[in-house]
């Protein structure tokens, strides 16, 4: 049972990544799998549909890794640009982000370093930066780079196969250059490995580990999610099970329905199907806040045959 002060701070989070101290965060099997894999240096990727909790998983995993002295950087690939940018600009932008996030600016003159590498391609510069700068100046026992919204590379005017080949090369170098044992990557996005690779002869993902991010199950969601329901309904576990039956455990919709119970339920034994019909299905376009169903519709409309 929650104390009054707990309830005062409790809220369901609909959309966006959950802060590390969110009481409504649901720990799933994927949390432990990803943490364990990254701790031992495995290359991981979390590919799933939108609003499945990838960003929240990344935030929580980063917090736990950093508590274990792992140096972490999260780069939102959408910030690096889309169709308008050149390959040179894109890779340089990635280096700038890594310099910024790892706070290297005070010990590293990026402009001078670049002037020394003008004869190298952008991907060669990134490779050199990783080995000669990142792995030297970041002294933590391990380094983990998260690349979020990685599916955005599909909108670029050039192939990023070289990026994934470089990630694979970092792993293959471990056998003869132990410094690379300190470095690992985690890719997150709405994609499949084959979506991201233009040249199908390249297979960078066969060295990686896929983390399966599935919907909430009652056993794992019961403790965090019933806490907000206890003051509003008589049987919070029963109500939560009804919510999960409707949402299939999809995180966004589950949080949204829990919040609707708190805000809209007319009795302590709410009819979840009625709430779904009234506040999600009927006039859905005007009630789709924050946008979720519209995003699904737009992606379906825009995804013609490849």
Name each model feature, range by range:
Residues 177, 191-208:
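Short regulatory helix/loop adjacent to the ATP-binding pocket of P-loop NTPases
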Residues 2-65, 132-136, 228:
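Walker A/P-loop-proximal flanking segment of P-loop NTPase domains
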Residues 3, 219-222, 226-306:
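Winged-helix-like regulatory helical subdomains adjacent to P-loop NTPase cores
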Residues 97, 101-147, 151-161, 166-168, ...:
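Mid-core helix/loop region of P-loop NTP-binding domains shared across ATPases and GTPases
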Residues 72, 84-108:
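Conserved NTP-binding/hydrolysis module of P-loop NTPases
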Residues 208-219:
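Conserved AAA+ ATPase "SRH/arginine-finger" region at the nucleotide-binding site
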Residues 63-83, 144:
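Conserved catalytic segments around the Walker B and adjacent sensor/switch elements
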Residues 149, 182-193, 257-260:
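A short beta-strand-to-loop transition that corresponds to the Sensor-1 phosphate-sensing loop
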